[in-house]
């Protein structure tokens, strides 16, 4: 089995692939102070509850946007799985994906892996929207190259900033309001956050398509992407497995 680990700014995803399909996925809050022992204790406990034998793991691939967390995940793989993990972004690691931007070294590992995961699953030119701490729009050409993109604040980050900067505005749940014009503070905030974000997504997608000049397929992924299902006019597919699929592809290309 292969263990893939996606360390994001907010959440960390652990997923197991048995050579044919994904068999388990677990999610925890990202905490760079957690040791390898902490991760192992949590992971083994969940695996035992579901009857999963982690001693069968023969490889590990890690994508991390949190540099301070990498040491502990490397130790997790070495000490508890007895494997040497592959880390996205390490010298010599092959992704097979050209990065056609001015400073390739500045592109986050998660964005490259998501672009790869989308390319192997969907034909043609793509826009990959990843909604997490930040919302990224990544452009993938039909020949499998990362062509650049857009980075904007994530929906939760925007909502938290609104609450933190304005003392009288409450924390709210993100949900679609019944109408655009809010009739109280909460519905007005929900309209601004939810509908405002849908307009951000749809507006930027339309501008990207106009600039690109060729048909593009739009795929949404990330922790809050499902919130937009049925509300966006431009998203074609919702796919939560893009990044772990990309990690699996990296593993295959570096065996």
From Swiss-Prot:
- Can you tell me which residues form the catalytic site? 110 (proton acceptor)
Q: Report the protein name in the record.
A: Type III pantothenate kinase
The Enzyme Commission number assigned here is 2.7.1.33
A single GO molecular-function term is: pantothenate kinase activity
- Keywords from the UniProt entry: ATP-binding, Coenzyme A biosynthesis, Cytoplasm, Kinase, Metal-binding, Nucleotide-binding, Potassium, Transferase
- TM ranges: none
Residues the record lists as binding ATP: 6-13, 133
Lineage of producing organism: Bacteria, Pseudomonadati, Pseudomonadota, Alphaproteobacteria, Hyphomonadales
Q: Where in the cell is it found?
A: Cytoplasm
Which gene underlies this protein? coaX
What binding partners and quaternary form does the record give? Homodimer.
Q: According to its UniProt record, which cofactors does this protein need?
A: NH4(+); K(+)
Reaction(s) catalyzed by this protein? (R)-pantothenate + ATP = (R)-4'-phosphopantothenate + ADP + H(+)
Q: Name one Pfam family in it.
A: Pan_kinase
Q: Cofactor binding mode, per the note?
A: A monovalent cation. Ammonium or potassium.
Question: Which pathway or pathways does this protein act in?
Answer: Cofactor biosynthesis; coenzyme A biosynthesis; CoA from (R)-pantothenate: step 1/5
């Amino acid at each position: 089995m292969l263990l893939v680990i996606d360390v994001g700014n907010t959440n960390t995803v652990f997923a197991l692939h048995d050579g044919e399909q994904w068999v388990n996925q677990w999610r925890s809050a990202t905490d760079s102070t957690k040791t390898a022992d902490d991760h192992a204790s949590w992971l083994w406990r969940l695996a035992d509850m579901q009857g999963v034998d982690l001693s069968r793991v023969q490889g590990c691939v890690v994508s991390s946007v949190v540099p301070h967390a990498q040491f502990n995940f490397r130790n997790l793989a070495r000490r508890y799985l007895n494997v040497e993990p592959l880390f996205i972004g390490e010298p010599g690691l092959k992704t097979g994906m050209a990065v056609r931007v001015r400073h390739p070294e500045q592109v986050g590992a998660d964005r490259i892996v998501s672009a790869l995961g989308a390319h192997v699953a969907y034909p043609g030119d793509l826009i990959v929207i990843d909604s997490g701490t930040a919302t990224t729009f990544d452009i993938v050409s039909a020949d499998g190259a990362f062509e650049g993109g857009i980075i904007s604040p994530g929906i939760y980050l925007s909502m938290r900033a609104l609450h933190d900067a304005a003392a009288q505005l409450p924390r709210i749940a993100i949900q679609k309001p019944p109408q655009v014009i809010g009739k109280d503070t909460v519905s007005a905030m929900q309209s601004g956050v939810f509908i405002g974000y849908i307009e951000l997504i749809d507006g930027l997608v339309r501008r990207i398509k106009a600039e690109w000049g060729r048909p593009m397929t739009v795929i949404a992924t990330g922790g809050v992407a499902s919130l937009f299902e049925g509300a966006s006019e431009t998203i074609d597919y919702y796919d939560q497995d893009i990044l772990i699929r990309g990690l699996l592809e990296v593993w295959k290309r570096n065996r």
